[in-house]
Design a protein with these regions (language model features):
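Catalytic cores of soluble metabolic enzymes centered on carboxylation/carboxyl-transfer
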Residues: 1-43
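Conserved "landmark" site that anchors the functional core of diverse proteins
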Residues: 41-549
Length: 549
């Protein structure tokens, strides 16, 4: 029984484990009335009230599947989450609970040591107020109630040993949109029973605690206000390629308000409309924000038309809109605490500055003591002789090779673009060649490769390989790729079912029209728009073209 794993709907597995562990069972003195006096102590936490969008998450989340569109998920405020695990002494990979604006009410069926971090939700234990940021002993039968967030947006609960939920694609994090991970692949509901891991069991996959519980130094407790300063790196798309320099300057000079239509997929911002250097996106679309493809970095600020959205932990991996800046990894936790109505001022930082901040944050988590990063000069946003300040390097086209542009996409990503902004299979083959060459090298610090049509995103760990060393590697590999005009690669034909104008698609268009943009050339019906711009006489021709391709 100790080696048995059963997940999902609650079972009597632990009940049986406790029965076979009794002296009566071992001595063979069990009789028909034995269970009348047997009181089990289930290692679970019962959900009396689920709170708002409460879910199981772990750090760093579900990495390695960005190329097939699976997001990392994980805690929106990973700083508070990791500190919660550190306070109770857990291994960093232990699963914890995230809740948004309104916390849950939980009944403990076993003794436990817990820690609350993040937004202060006026927590009480059996009606008595308790404090965040320190270990707390909870006895079996007690009720922990979390109210509405006083400051900030998201709170976190860590329990010593972590929550016992199965790993899916290498993570216990909930991706509710995909309906997998966490507890039953969804947010919490009334009467859910959340099992606590027991590392002593052979079936347990959660590592045991690594230290004794320890309170956080008061100087380290973050301040959650309504005005935020967030450090970003310029790029991948800037001036003068896409935006005017005036638009970039205005972006950094403005206070951006957090829109109510924000969640774990993205945080919508309200602010000034940008000015563009292009009239449209060419082949990619009617709006100048359109590009054929862009692999998105977590923390990228994505302009869907004239409207910016911070792409977060459950967001899309690939799209067709430009991103002028990307939030530094050590600053991204702040996005998890902004709430509707808050204001954000972004400020540019360098890759070296971002790395120093990340190292300082890591030291704080490791030691639970203050650690300050050195200061760095503010990087220039002005256009250079080689073009936009977002461009790390560029290689001119030749008779047999396309232009290659290497764009900074935060402190953890480089975006490589080939050729012009057109749909060309030869460019996709070159992306494939580069991806294979990088994979074969297996360079330490190069962690993930995500291809698009004419682009490749490289995710790297700047603590292992610097941006400059990565660029040297990429430029060196580019010189070895050569001409792809005669390249042959293994291929196959995949037949996929597809619904035309499905109700879910029509519903998405309706929501877009209601919440994002009321009037646009492609509204109110996308098929009518495609028919019109392609000069077709009947809308059925759109369907026929699609299915006959």
């Amino acid at each position: 029984l100790d080696a048995t794993q059963l997940h999902g709907i609650a079972t009597n597995l632990d009940y049986l484990r406790q029965i076979v562990a009794t002296e009566a069972f071992h001595s063979g003195t069990v009789w028909t009335r034995f269970l009348d006096s047997f009181t089990p102590a289930a290692p679970v936490i019962e959900v009396l009230q689920p709170g708002t969008f409460s879910s199981i998450q772990d750090y760093p989340g579900r990495l390695g599947y960005w190329d097939i569109g699976v997001p990392p998920s994980g805690p929106m405020d990973d700083f508070a989450f990791r500190l919660a695990n550190r306070i109770v002494g857990n291994d960093e990979s232990a699963a914890g609970l995230e809740f948004t604006l309104q916390g849950p009410t939980l009944r403990f069926h076993t003794d436990a040591t817990v820690a609350l971090t993040g937004a202060d939700c006026a927590a009480t234990l059996d009606g008595e107020p308790i404090s965040n940021w320190q270990p707390l002993t909870v006895k079996a039968g007690q009720t922990l109630a979390l109210g509405r967030a006083q400051q900030g947006c998201r709170g976190y609960l860590a329990v010593r040993n972590g929550f016992d939920v199965p790993e899916y694609l290498g993570s216990r994090s909930t991706f509710s949109l995909g309906q997998f991970g966490g507890h039953a692949g969804r947010t919490l509901r009334v009467a859910d029973m959340l099992p606590i891991s027991r590392p002593a069991l052979a079936a347990c996959t959660t590592p045991p605690p690594v230290s004794a519980p320890q309170a956080l130094d008061a100087a380290l407790i973050p301040h959650y206000g309504t005005e935020w300063r967030i450090g970003v790196l310029y790029g991948p798309h800037g001036a003068p390629d896409f935006f005017t320099q005036a638009a970039i300057d205005e972006f950094f000079a403005s206070d951006w308000q957090v829109h109510y239509n924000s969640n774990r997929l993205g945080v919508r911002l309200v602010g000034p409309k940008p000015s563009w250097t292009r009239a449209n996106g060419g082949e990619a679309g009617l709006h100048p924000s359109n590009v054929h493809d862009c692999e998105y970095a977590i923390g990228a600020i994505n302009f869907t038309g004239d409207f910016p959205v911070i792409l977060t932990h459950d967001g899309p991996s690939l799209g067709g809109f430009v991103c002028p800046v990307t939030i530094a990894k050590a600053e991204l936790w702040k996005v998890g605490q902004v709430k509707p109505g808050d204001r954000i001022r972004f400020h540019p930082i360098s890759a070296d500055d971002a790395l120093a901040r990340e190292k300082a944050q890591q030291q704080v988590i490791a030691t639970l003591r203050p650690h300050h990063a050195p200061t760095f000069a503010v990087p220039s946003l002005a256009e250079t002789a080689s073009g936009s300040a977002t461009i790390l390097a560029a290689i001119d086209a030749t008779a047999t090779t396309p232009q290659a542009v290497y764009r900074q996409a935060g402190d953890k990503y480089v975006l490589i673009e080939y050729g012009d902004n057109v749909l060309d299979l030869a460019l996709r083959l070159r992306v494939h060649l580069l991806m294979m060459a990088l994979s074969e090298r297996a360079v330490p610090g190069v962690e993930e490769l995500s291809p698009g049509v004419r682009s490749l995103q490289v995710r790297y760990d700047s603590r292992i390989i610097s941006q400059s060393d990565l660029m040297s590697l990429l430029l060196g590999l580019e010189a070895t790729l050569g001409d792809v005009s005669t390249l042959k690669v293994p291929s196959r034909v995949v037949w996929m079912p597809m619904a035309f104008e499905d109700s879910a698609t029509l519903g998405a268009v309706a929501r877009y029209q209601e919440t994002v943009r009321a009037c646009a050339p492609w509204l109110p019906n996308n098929v009518d728009f495609i028919q019109r711009i392609n000069g077709l006489t009947q809308r059925e021709q759109v369907r026929d073209t699609l299915f006959n391709a």
